[in-house]
Amino acid sequence: MYVQERVSLMTILKKIRILDFSHVYYGPYATMIMADLGAEVIKVEPVWGEVAREYDPKFGGVSQVFHYLDRNKRGVTLNLKDPKGKKIALELASKSDVVIENFSRGAMDRLGLGYEDIKKVKPDIIYASLSGFGLDGPYAKRPSFASIASSMSGWYRLTGDLVDPEGPPVMPAEWHGDLDPGLYAVIGMMGALLHREWTGEGQHIDVSQLDCMIAQNGIPITGYLMSGMLPYEHRQKRTGLRFMGPFEASNGWVFIHTSPRMTERLMKGMGVEKLESRANLENWTAERTVKEVVDALIAVGVPAAPINSLKEVVEDPHVNHRGMIVSVEHPDAGTVRSPNHPIKYSRVKPEMRSAAPLLGQHNEEVLTDLGYSAEEIEGLREAKIIT
């Protein structure tokens, strides 16, 4: 009975409507999270479709990026440069709680869809502008991608320093310069929604990729500002963490994370009385399988884990017990399996309600909700204002 009740409870953002003009990773990741939490997200694409549909590899003619980031959304197409398309966008905005965009600076203003324009039809709108460098400052008009923010924030240099301070910068897996700022955009939208609940006021949210990635590097930056020393210089002064990092086992790799206080536990797990160098630990792991190393160390309270491939991740029994892989049916791609929303709530349940939309899939129902007749909708299609 409890499980049935839990599933039937309304989701956190069920009454929130988001008009989503964003594209690629940055904005769509933020709105995906909001949609997972129950918000109605109306994704607005150009009549030819947003560029992220076209990235390889494709499944059912649509990229893996779009399948993942645009699930749980309703999809409409609009030619925003046409006055009738702009009119529809303003009508949708007037019935929305949040507008989000990540166009180049000034693009929405030129279309007549900037914050001040939307405020005229929805005074308490929350308007989230996502960009590389923010709405002001010397770099505000520069183009940006995730890699640019990660480079300028020190992220790539810090990662390279972990390998070799004298070597090249290292680009980590995945686009954290998009995904991390996307999470900050979620925080910003949720905070603004709460502020509006208290005060009745909407506001303009300015989310900069560079600002967010600097915040993500907050600890090493704080250390540098207080000491004048870079993180690798601090590490060179310490010896207690020499037993932390990736180690090769006989059939793969493990990551062992110790602190100076764990050395005795580490020796106990290894079954040795002396541990004089990193080479001793490397030799020990090399003679054992990944499972043997991990089992021996976690038995004595030393954090250790296999360094998994994606195949091993999705087959991991704990991952599946936690419900982290979910499925949804797509009309062209078939079954789409992807990671679930990661947060578990005791009273609500984020849901995989629908696959990413086909191009213009919800044009008719969204326009009908606005009061457009079937004849008017067909006229918009013939005029190429919608698909």
Predicted segments with their positions:
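N-terminal helix-loop segment corresponding to the beta1-alpha1 unit
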Residues: 2-198, 291, 358, 364-387
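Short beta-strands and strand-loop turn motifs
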Residues: 101-102, 275-276, 346
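Short solvent-exposed loop/turn micro-motifs enriched in small/polar/acidic residues
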Residues: 59-62, 238-240, 336
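Terminal low-complexity tails and localization/encapsulation signals of metabolic enzymes
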Residues: 2-17, 242, 246-249, 257, ...
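Acidic, glycine-rich segments within the central catalytic cores of soluble metabolic enzymes
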Residues: 151-295, 304, 323-333
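Conserved PLP cofactor-binding pocket of PLP-dependent enzymes
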Residues: 296-319
